[in-house]
Amino acid sequence: MRVVHTINELRQALAATRPAALVPTMGSLHEGHLALVKQARDHGGPVVASIFVNRLQFAPHEDFDRYPRTLERDCDLLKGVGCNLVFAPTESELYPEPQTYKVQPPGELADVLEGAFRPGFFTGVCTVVMKLFQCVQPRVAVFGKKDYQQLMVLRGMVRQFALPIEIVAVDTARADDGLALSSRNAYLSEPERAEAPQLAATLHTVQAAVLAAVKSGARIDAAALEAQAMGTLRSRGWAPDYVALRRSSDLQAPADPTAEPLVVLAAARLGKTRLIDNLEI
């Protein structure tokens, strides 16, 4: 496995190979990231993992400065699962001048849910991913479903810009107790880590209620289910930003929750740590 830090080195390394499969990451890797690399290997060609903590997707009050940076450990993990090339640019390499040209996704998808609580987040994500796509020129790019809204935004970007890239989605990797794996789980104290699986459990409760209503033909009151779920989290010491039942096709509120595929998404703070999760229904 080779590690490169400049765009020129990256392009030289890929010049004589088949089109690559790209796994974009911010580092601080866990088993969920490694599952993406393993999936990328199934698509032929070299597997490229990028490691870059992207300032553009962090608000000033967020955790850019303290986000874990563990490049040596990450490279060891990537080598162990068959990654061929790691692209780990510096900030000045990827952004040699102020990034005044940005990719602005549509508000109906990017300004709701995560976008409502993290203004500019998806603009930062789309801009850096577009730049990585231009650097790597992959045939396939692999993303996890844990960041469900991000996945949908990026699929839309690829479609509307006619990029010749297949976006592959991989199911959320979870700990044995159900907690979605995340680099930010490292921020949790021991008591918080014990409580953290309750976020997934709350989503399972919503999922079960929807499936039971569909089976019985009962009316689904999405707003009531969302409010009940948020109340459950608050009663356990969480500070929820949202629990939202949405159409999985476009993340809009369903006119008839019994008639179309759904996803329930949530974001909540436990102590100082903000966690997100989702379940398809």
Curated annotation (Swiss-Prot):
Enzyme class, broadest EC rank = ligase
* Protein's UniProt keywords contain Ligase: yes
Q: What sections of the protein cross the membrane? A: none
More about this protein: The reaction proceeds by a bi uni uni bi ping pong mechanism.
Q: Which reaction does it catalyse?
A: (R)-pantoate + beta-alanine + ATP = (R)-pantothenate + AMP + diphosphate + H(+)
Residues bound to beta-alanine are Q57
Q: Main location per UniProt? A: cytoplasm
- Recorded protein name is Pantothenate synthetase
Residues at which (R)-pantoate binds: Q57, Q150
